[in-house]
């Protein structure tokens, strides 16, 4: 196997490497309701750091690890929930794939003292770290970890390759988005050579839906609304749908893609109720060709990428839908 080549050689990883080498304790964390990129990046970096450093390495996610990613090595090491108030603070916190500190779901005082390293590929990232490595050229944060490992002279193994492969697979919509450049395919080849197994990973990620997941899928699709002369498609999951189907937020993964797949649709909108806070809604956007949904989400206080983005809004469903409709129609009006 030839030595892997970095995707972007001009990124300066030295501040991260220096902070990691000097730290006695490090916590890796990703955003609330984590996705494949956050979890895959976390697992790959954890596997490297437990070998590279003498310090204590741990992982903590407010919402743990989604079931479909629990096959990744080290996933059982993730601590879940609020950070214990009596626990010692680490020297370094590494936030992965998170555009804003608030999305980590931890209290502000948790970040007082430790060096906070922010590694992310969202253009809307708020640069909340003491050290910020934020680069929207990358297709996934996992691809950034690939380059970081090369900078650390850490070889790929099956655990690292599998984590990065999951991160890249899920954040490129199975290598379909425009961010999937020739360099990304070359990276994928390096990952497979190092032990990542595309078909078993695909089965775990895409072919392991629970029965309740099927129920919520049919209930969600029953809510489909076509708007903007057929150029936007809207689907919903309410508290009532959660109760009737017995599903949870993990089971809603990918539902918005059915709306985007409709011929003629340029923007898909998925509005789901927050499982914890009443009248708080998570709004997801998916774009097809002409609309930058990252900019659309930014109008509503959120962010993301050109083809995938989101925000969080409060109010009744009708109020939220009305606000989103104005922004969607405005985005479509130029095309």
Whereabouts are the PLM-identified features?
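Short, hinge-like loop/turn segments at secondary-structure boundaries
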Residues: 46, 74-78, 134-137, 286-287
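Conserved beta-strand scaffold positions in the cores of enzyme catalytic domains, especially
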Residues: 116-118, 132-133, 232-234, 270
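Short glycine-rich anion-binding loops that position phosphate/pyrophosphate groups of nucleotides
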Residues: 33-34, 98-101, 122-124, 239-240, ...
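Hydrophobic helix-and-loop "lid/oligomerization" segment in the mid-to-C-terminal part
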Residues: 2-32, 40-70, 84-90, 170-299, ...
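Active-site cofactor/cluster-binding pocket
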Residues: 73-131
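Generic enzyme active-site microenvironment
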Residues: 29, 33, 95, 118-119, ...
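Short glycine/serine/threonine-rich phosphate/pyrophosphate-binding segments
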Residues: 36-42, 101-104
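Short alpha-helices
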Residues: 119-188
């Amino acid at each position: 196997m030839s030595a892997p080549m970095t995707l972007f050689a001009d990124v300066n990883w030295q501040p991260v490497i220096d902070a990691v080498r000097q730290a006695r304790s490090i916590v890796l964390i990703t955003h609330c309701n984590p996705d494949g990129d956050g979890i895959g990046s976390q697992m790959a970096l954890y596997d490297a750091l437990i070998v590279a450093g003498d310090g204590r390495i741990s992982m903590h996610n407010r919402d743990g690890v989604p079931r479909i990613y629990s096959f990744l090595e080290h996933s059982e090491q993730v601590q879940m929930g609020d950070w214990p108030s009596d626990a010692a603070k680490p020297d370094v916190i590494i936030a992965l794939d998170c555009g804003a500190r608030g999305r980590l779901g931890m209290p502000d005082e948790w970040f007082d003292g430790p060096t906070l390293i922010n590694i992310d590929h969202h253009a809307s990232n708020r640069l909340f770290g003491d050290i910020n490595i934020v680069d929207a050229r990358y297709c996934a944060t996992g691809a950034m970890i690939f380059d970081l490992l090369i900078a650390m002279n850490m070889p790929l193994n099956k655990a690292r390759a599998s984590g990065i492969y999951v991160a890249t697979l899920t954040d490129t919509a199975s290598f379909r988005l425009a961010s999937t450049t020739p360099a990304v395919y070359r990276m994928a080849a390096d990952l497979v050579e190092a032990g990542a197994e595309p078909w078993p990973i695909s089965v775990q990620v895409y072919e392991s839906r629970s029965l309740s997941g099927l129920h919520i899928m049919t209930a969600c699709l029953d809510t489909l609304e076509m708007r903007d002369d057929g150029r936007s498609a809207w689907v919903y999951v309410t508290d009532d749908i959660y109760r009737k189907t017995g599903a949870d937020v993990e089971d809603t993964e990918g539902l918005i893609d059915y709306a985007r797949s409709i011929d003629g649709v340029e923007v898909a909108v998925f509005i789901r109720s927050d499982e914890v806070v009443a009248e708080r809604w998570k709004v997801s956007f998916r774009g097809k060709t002409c609309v930058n949904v990252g900019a659309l989400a930014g109008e509503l206080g959120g962010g993301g990428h050109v083809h995938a983005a989101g925000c969080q809004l409060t109010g009744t469903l009708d109020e939220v839908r009305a606000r989103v409709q104005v922004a969607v129609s405005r985005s479509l009006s130029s095309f």
